[in-house]
A protein has these predicted regions:
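Conserved PLP-anchoring active-site segment centered on the Schiff-base-forming lysine
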Residues: 82-84
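N-terminal flexible segment immediately upstream of the FAD-binding catalytic core
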Residues: 1-72, 89-119, 134, 148, ...
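Residue-level detector of anion-binding/catalytic polar loops
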Residues: 79-80, 142
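FAD-binding subdomain of flavoenzyme oxidoreductases
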Residues: 110-193
């Protein structure tokens, strides 16, 4: 098996953990910042469980403004950030790093709008893939990119990984089924594409 080459650990970040956690706790509610070993344990891996590492901290923001402020702070302090949807990916996209913040997007779990006339849904990144299908199936619709993890995987993770499933042969993968995204860049800038 090939070893995953990981970035070199920045010891200066590890030495500043308490200062970083304190600042992050000012950017979101304190209960949304996890930093104790027992709190971090569930985040030591994604579905690629052959690799485990405890993140510096986990931050669970509740809105775009908080994400923007967290990323702006981390960018200004050269703190790595690993975004995480539901952690169901097998490609290593959400692997935690010892000197990085894991930015969990699970609290962004609302469907904001369903527009049947234009065949589109506006959703936050933490909504599950299957959650979208359940929301529209009573009108005869479903969300076609359906990975085997559709019960638990998040739309944000689907976008990040360009997920697909058995229906992708006919309807394409995630990029073929989205009209746009709002995302926060690493410097905290909010962009729409």
């Amino acid at each position: 098996m090939t070893e995953i080459a990981l970035p070199k650990i920045d010891i200066s970040i590890l030495n500043r953990k308490s200062e970083i956690v304190k600042k992050l706790s000012k950017l979101t509610d304190r209960e949304n910042v996890l930093s104790e070993s027992d709190e971090l344990r569930p985040y030591e891996t994604d579905a690629l469980s052959v690799y485990t590492q405890t993140p510096l901290a986990v931050v669970l923001p509740e809105n775009t403004k908080e994400v923007s402020e967290i990323l702006k702070y981390c960018h200004s302090q050269n703190i790595k950030v690993v975004p995480r949807g539901a952690g169901t990916g097998l490609s290593g996209g959400a692997l935690p790093l010892q000197d990085a913040i894991l930015l969990g997007l699970g609290k962004f779990n609302k469907i904001l709008e369903i527009d049947y006339k234009n065949n589109c849904v506006v959703t936050q990144p933490g909504v599950t893939n299957l959650g979208i299908t359940h929301a529209v199936e009573h009108k005869g619709f479903y969300y076609a990119p359906d990975p085997s993890s559709q019960l638990a995987c998040s739309i944000g993770g689907n976008v990040a990984e360009n997920s697909g499933g058995v229906h992708s042969l006919k309807y394409g993968t995630t990029t073929n089924n989205i009209l746009g995204v709002e995302m926060v860049m690493m410097d905290g800038t909010v962009c729409r594409f």
